[in-house]
Amino acid sequence: MLCRSFNISQLAIPFVSVLISFLAYTSQLFFYYFEEAPLRSEEFWRLNIFAVCIWVCYYRACTVDPGRIPKDWTPPNLKQLEKDCAGGRQRWCRRCEAFKPPRAHHCKTCQRCIPKMDHHCPWTSNCVSHFTYPHFMRFLFYAVVGMGYLETLLFERASIVWASRHLPSYLGPGLGQLVHLFILLVVNSLTWLALFILLLRSIWSLALNTTTIESWEIERHETLLRRARHFGGYLSGPGGIQIRIKKQEFPYDIGIWSNIRAGMGGSANVLSWFWPFAATPDRSTGLEFEVNGFEDPNLSWPPPDPDRIPLPAKREDMSAAIAAADASYHRALQARNIQRSNDASHSGGHPIQRRKRFHDRFNENKAKERLSESESDFSDDEEVQDGEEGWKNSEGDRLRDFGVDEEAEFYDEEDIPLGILMQRRRQQ
């Protein structure tokens, strides 16, 4: 039973804790016995202050709740939501059975929608979100600065060893000390380099006010624009519908200063950005965000994606005249739609139809295969697990690499009318 419930990701936090302890404390043990250059008092205090800051920030990045969407939250503009749904901008999570605020995504690990989700970090076993992002940034900062300082101390001792390499061995450190120094240098250097690159990338994203997922969405949008140019500005969606693809500016880049302030909890106090015990952002925030006004404020992000539009709803085989005359038919149909939607969401329902990759569909259409367009757009091969949701950016990442539930982001059983979604929400 224990083996079945074990997941290797459960070792992430213990591994990081052991790594921090190894670098922070066994290094001091090495310095203590290194007679050629023992640890000075000011070096001792700096090392331990950095270690405390790293521990505090890492603990908070691991334990602070990444946030939840209030059960009673609904979009402020329902009329605009109707237009968004019609244009492929539906913000309804079929996993949570709730509306998704801007910048929220469904995390497959946390199993809920996360406000302003950046990614699910395996090393903290927690989502980096609107509420945990400041703690995550401070952890990266103090880890890079602390290990950078440790690197200078290790390099100083390594230089002493190298300078005395021609002296008799009994005049220098023992074999155990040399091995310890070598391991410390290698582990600290590699870890520092990896975290330094991650910190630079995170600072860049912070300055632009883009999450990791949104950077992926921006690159995806640019890819769709290139595809659409080949087809006169349009791409085909499910059922053969034509979707207009036009360039849309990222709406949340509001200036470097405002971007950094918003990402670090909303405070304009620069010192609080570096304070390990700084307060978590107010829990009432994270549902609405300031926009730059470059686009129509009613346009949502991400832009329309033909491969993220729900399948067109199936029509009942009954004439419009009979349907209009029979009110009970409408009530029964609505109840049946709600029940079918609930069954599909909670018990698996109908299997998800995955759209084939764009290039596969393009080649099939070009070759004029005998299948109809609606049939050839979707794959029935259960062994083909990667449809268009398997699209990767230039770095080889797809949405699931950031912890996002791809099925919840890309597919739905059918295009459920907004009225039915609202009624289903009230019945919960």
Swiss-Prot record:
Listed name of the protein: Palmitoyltransferase pfa4
Keywords of this entry: Acyltransferase, Endoplasmic reticulum, Lipoprotein, Membrane, Palmitate, Transferase, Transmembrane, Transmembrane helix
HAMAP family with a match to the protein in the record: DHHC_PAT_PFA4 (MF_03199)
Function, in words: Mediates the reversible addition of palmitate to target proteins, thereby regulating their membrane association and biological function.
Entry membrane topology: Multi-pass membrane protein
Gene Ontology biological process: protein targeting to membrane
Keyword presence, Lipoprotein: yes
Family: Belongs to the DHHC palmitoyltransferase family. PFA4 subfamily.
Keyword check for Endoplasmic reticulum: yes
Cytoplasmic face of the membrane: 1-10, 62-134, 199-428
Molecular-function annotations in GO: protein-cysteine S-palmitoyltransferase activity
Spans within the Lumenal topological domain: 32-43, 156-177
Biased composition, class Acidic residues, residue ranges: 374-388
A Pfam family reported for this protein in Swiss-Prot or TrEMBL: DHHC
Sequence ranges assigned to domain DHHC in this UniProt record: 91-141
Entry's free-text remark on domains: The DHHC domain is required for palmitoyltransferase activity.
